[in-house]
Amino acid sequence: MTEYLLLFVGTVLVNNFVLVKFLGLCPFMGVSKKLETAIGMGLATTFVLTLASVCAWMVNSFILLPLGLIYLRTLAFILVIAVVVQFTELVVRKTSPTLYRLLGIFLPLITTNCAVLGVALLNVNQSHNFMQSAVYGFSAAAGFSLVMVLFAAIRERLAVADVPAPFRGSSIALITAGLMSLAFMGFTGLVKF
């Protein structure tokens, strides 16, 4: 149990996919202008990332490795992610039409989110078992969601702040992301791998 807790804390805080590995920057910058959209995108990404991580592990363990098709790993994972995203899109459309409208084009773009593919590939490279894959996928998504919600809250405050003209828009957003990355570096000594 301690192993899974360390994996969770280490992935969420110490090795955050956005701030440390720089994966998932497109939705991080694109969806983080409003807090409600960031929360919705975070929930959708959490569902997709966790499910895709587990499905990719199963495809790798039960199909690719036994058949010696390891060279098709990236292509197979992209197909798995596309299927999971389409399933998520159907679920969100049926359960929450408002959230579906808010997410707009960003929901299908989860398919091309490099963080989702990155988690699947890192699961395989780090030789995680089924449970570790599920925890790693969920914790990567939780870290992504945490950072995106924090960033969206900061950006909403910056929208009404008196920011100098040269720093308005993307400039202050990138500076803020850099400062968040520095803040998360404080967690570096928290978990030893």
UniProtKB/Swiss-Prot annotation:
GO CC terms of this entry: plasma membrane
Pfam families in the cross-refs: Rnf-Nqr
Superkingdom field: Bacteria
Membrane spanning stretches: 5-25, 39-59, 62-82, 102-122, 134-154, 171-191
Bilayer disposition of the protein: Multi-pass membrane protein
GO BP field: electron transport chain
Signal peptide from the UniProt entry: none
Localization of this protein: Cell inner membrane
Keywords: Cell inner membrane, Cell membrane, Electron transport, Membrane, Translocase, Transmembrane, Transmembrane helix, Transport
EC number assigned by the record: 7.-.-.-
General function of this protein: Part of a membrane-bound complex that couples electron transfer with translocation of ions across the membrane.
Family: Belongs to the NqrDE/RnfAE family.
Complex and partners: The complex is composed of six subunits: RnfA, RnfB, RnfC, RnfD, RnfE and RnfG.
NCBIfam families for the chain: PRK05151.1, rnfA
Listed name of the protein: Ion-translocating oxidoreductase complex subunit A
Species per Swiss-Prot/TrEMBL record: Yersinia pestis
Gene name of the record: rnfA
